[in-house]
Amino acid sequence: MNRQSWLLNLSLLKTHPAFRAVFLARFISIVSLGLLGVAVPVQIQMMTHSTWQVGLSVTLTGSAMFVGLMVGGVLADRYERKKVILLARGTCGIGFIGLCLNALLPEPSLLAIYLLGLWDGFFASLGVTALLAATPALVGRENLMQAGAITMLTVRLGSVISPMLGGVLLATGGVAWNYGLAAAGTFITLLPLLSLPALPPPPQPREHPLKSLLAAFRFLLSSPLIGGIALLGGLLTMASAVRVLYPALAINWHMSAAQIGLLYAAIPLGAAVGALTSGQLAHSVRPGLLMLVSTVGSFLAIGVFGLMPVWLLGVICLALFGWLSAISSLLQYTLLQTQTPEAMLGRINGLWTAQNVTGDAIGAALLGGLGAMMTPVASASVSGFGLVIVGLLLMLLLGELRRFRQPPPVPDGAPL
């Protein structure tokens, strides 16, 4: 492939065996978690007939993930990262086995589902931060943009396949099959991960875990560059919460059940296109400015989305949001990994991922509140245009990020 192509270069999977192992493990893991994501709400709904109970399980799991990201960040900067990844994956699989055994009981325990949800949410996120912190060592910092784009494609592809597979399993075998295959898939991921090289953390003084986490917070707040990236990431995740308005907007547009699915598919499709056409992003001399512009553009797409007279134009706006948000996210990921000191990669990655989780929850709550006071169309537009104003202000305030320059990559003669 031509080095100047806009298309994503997949050669990293050929030239870096360790990254190929991570790619395979991540894809299997995403499919496994997707099976779980379909089964848990369906089982709780069947047991309780309460959407509140379903929502409670999501909240508990999300809370455990937040804590896991914080703890995982500290562990990834303190202990051998490969061991943290393997421990987290294996422990997570044990929780899936517990869900499977519980589902096979004549009267499954609702409390067990909640407790195992806490268990799996914590340990799943524990491994995420260690894997993120280890990525620069696996591919080299010069290949982080390419690695991030390939990872994004993996996530999108797995997110499309797993719900469909999970639905088929539910219809044919029940939730126990979903849990059992999720457990099997999780343990299978250990095989490629065992081939990873040792990933020791950089040497640093021993300190209390809370003090270590506080040091990362201070670094995040004191660094205009890293702090600005994290802030943009949170706002972008808030904007993606517009999906809570899809059912109401579908009624306004008189959409059929099949057409509603296009709304949910539009953003992932746009993001996949963004990842596929990211071949030149690594050559950007001013990635900070490009990140700011793409983020504001994505907010504008959400603002215009709700104003569209027909649903097809709305789908196009969502796809545009997905494309622009993918560009911004890839730049965020790359700058965060390259500009963060090696000794803090675990904690900063944990904080960055945690604020994404928090941003989604805050965005959903705000849109839900707006929906109670105004029409769905107005809610989507107000949120989008409000974020545009915030984004424009940040373009003025985040001067260091806006002016940040990096030299273009030097060709290394690697096969393309």
UniProtKB/Swiss-Prot annotation:
InterPro entries to which the protein is assigned, alphabetical = Enterobactin_exp_EntS, MFS_dom, MFS_trans_sf, TM_effector
Q: Which residues cross the membrane?
A: 22-42, 56-76, 84-104, 110-130, 157-177, 179-199, 219-239, 257-277, 288-307, 314-336, 357-377, 379-399
How does the entry describe its membrane topology?
A: Multi-pass membrane protein
Its annotated compartments are: Cell inner membrane
Keyword annotations from UniProtKB, A to Z: Cell inner membrane, Cell membrane, Membrane, Transmembrane, Transmembrane helix, Transport
Residues exposed to the Periplasmic side: 43-55, 105-109, 178, 240-256, 308-313, 378
Pfam families assigned: MFS_3
Metal-binding: is it a keyword of this entry? no
Which segments does the topology annotation call Cytoplasmic? Answer: 1-21, 77-83, 131-156, 200-218, 278-287, 337-356, 400-416
List GO terms (cellular component aspect): plasma membrane
Q: Does the keyword Membrane apply?
A: yes
Drop me one GO molecular function for this one.
Answer: enterobactin transmembrane transporter activity
Which Gene3D superfamilies does the UniProt entry name for this protein?
A: MFS general substrate transporter like domains (1.20.1250.20)
The job of this chain, per UniProt, is described as: Component of an export pathway for enterobactin.
Family from the record: Belongs to the major facilitator superfamily. EntS (TC 2.A.1.38) family.
Quote the protein name from its UniProt record: Enterobactin exporter EntS
